[in-house]
Amino acid sequence: MKFIVSSTALSSHLQAISRVINSKNALPILDCFLFELEDGTLSVTVSDSETTMVTTVEVNESDTNGRFAVVAKTLLDALKEIPEQPLTFLINPDNYEITVQYQNGKYSLMGQNADEFPQSATLGDNAVRVEMEAEVLLGGINRSVFATADDELRPVMNGIYFDITTEDITMVASDGHKLVRCKTLAAKGNERAAFILPKKPATLLKNLLPKEQGSVTIEFDERNAVFMLDSYRMVCRLIEGRYPNYNSVIPQNNPYKVTVDRLQLLGALRRVSIFSSQASSLIKLRMQENLIVISAQDIDFSTSAEETLVCQYAGNPMSIGFKSTFLIDILNNISADEIVIELADPSRAGVIIPVEQEENEDLLMLLMPMMLND
């Protein structure tokens, strides 16, 4: 079996899919790339038994069809060191010996029998299909994946919930402290449907989608989802279970509204939070007429900080406490210049929305408050 392929094309595709591979695998074959050559098309597959990713690479020349597995790390490290040039792969089908010939030399390594590689999951007849622009899907994942939980007791919270209707698609993530709801009007389904995408495949998509143009086709049933991109195909196990009613936790009547420059607030939080209690990271926001006072103190070390920002606020003076790391996370994942913080009282969640929404998008973030001692 022989084929010739561009070194940089192969290396970049292998690099992209190698993130699927776990550092420790129960099955040794899962440390490998599965190469399959069929009618002049080379496809390479990786799997961690829950997520499988396949990429296709153009070959310049090939002879017979065939398949083999090869340890991913060895091949990746070897290809990284070769500048752009054609590589000739020669595979002995009897003992899986692989020779990679390049301009001034060759590599020899042992492959493995491809039959041991696990089959990827297939979808049932009741699979639902939706299409989204790559840019829209990337935007939703980017804004929400940081809010997913790591909760063994409530696994449904460990992923992004895709709520599909005939009018829009909403992506939701929450860890019980913060919540993100990103609704896009630029995509919709033919019927009401939903699925929960685990954090790992969501992060894999986050890395792949910036390179993609055009639309992504998503097909899913109760157990698995398939994401079809131009050069990649990802099959992943979904999180099974019922996602909580996210709309019911978003406070509807918030009489106090603070409009503030996002980057100014972010800078102030980063400075002031250095002096917050290491145990709680509590910062206090005190709103008064057109001013917001951000303060923190660490009683154990007798340190404190306070900073005042100009904002738009016309209500009664009010104070609320938040965990600074969570609030910084939220502000980092909004791109608008100005934000509105909507509040009802110090014991209810704060709703944070951009003053100017992106086109065809409705983004809302929510943060639970912390108790203030004073």
Predicted regions and their residues:
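Structural preference for solvent-exposed beta-strand-turn elements
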Residues: 1-374
